[in-house]
């Protein structure tokens, strides 16, 4: 068996190596493995056996890697944090995209902040009501290598309804005159020195994002880990921040195996957006092309039924996310090395 060995970049992003010794080989003909280790906290790491490293480097904005893992297939890693895995990304992306679109009476236009791998756009474009999707990602390099290697999303990138913009989502959303039925935050986790944390702040939600929502418009964002031990990292503060800006806010969670944790999303609007279970399933049947692999009405009801610990934490949270008072996931972005 191989041993996971890290050689760390200056900002803590691990380079993957292979180490061997006679005691690590169970059989004389067994191949040693490369392993990737993700640091979850100072005293906790997850390890993933690799087939190969498809891409690894540093763009202008973030450290990026695309790994071919034995268990989860191709995996996108940004600033040392797994963002998406081929085998189970459908859980994350179906939960991120479909509830908001199904709760809206007739969604036609969507703006995606981030989403460079193309999976969010793929799910949105399954909806027959959609006329236009703007996907705005800051990092051309991420988009380019995802288009090359994540072929499952090739149809989305070629769809005439998709407008791809390489730019800071905050600046792009601010300059646009149109309004959108749905705005999606498919952003990397907020890490210190990363490019995304400003897009989780109250000032951004209130002054830039909310004015770009059409009547009945819904905003939904990924909100980080939401497990028993991890929900206070950013999940509860993102939820509370959105409560300061929107009249109706709903949090929901699901377990994502490749993240080794429960994940959280938060949806918000100034217009009530709940629908009955039967109506939600009816809309899936009428509006969505193809079969969803994870989400149906009962599974969403389950996702939005939070356990006592998480419910109380959301209720008691007082922190409001701001540039001066930001919470971060463990780790550092590219800009941190220049601080």
From Swiss-Prot:
It is an enzyme of class 2 (transferase). It catalyses: S-adenosyl 3-(methylsulfanyl)propylamine + spermidine = thermospermine + S-methyl-5'-thioadenosine + H(+). Its EC number is 2.5.1.79. Changing residue 240 to S: In strain: cv. Bl-1. The active site is at 186 (proton acceptor). Disruption phenotype: Severe reduction in the length of stem internodes. Increased thickness of veins in leaves and inflorescence stems. Altered morphology of xylem vessel elements. Changing residue 123 to K: In acl5-1; loss of function. Pfam families: Spermine_synt_N, Spermine_synth. GO terms for biological process: auxin polar transport; phloem or xylem histogenesis; polyamine biosynthetic process; xylem vessel member cell differentiation. One of its GO terms (molecular function) is thermospermine synthase activity. Highly expressed in stem internodes and roots. Lower levels in young seedlings before flowering and rosette leaves. Expressed in the vascular tissues. Restricted to procambial and/or provascular cells during primary root development and early leaves development. Keywords: Polyamine biosynthesis, Transferase. Belongs to the spermidine/spermine synthase family. This is Thermospermine synthase ACAULIS5. It comes from Arabidopsis thaliana.
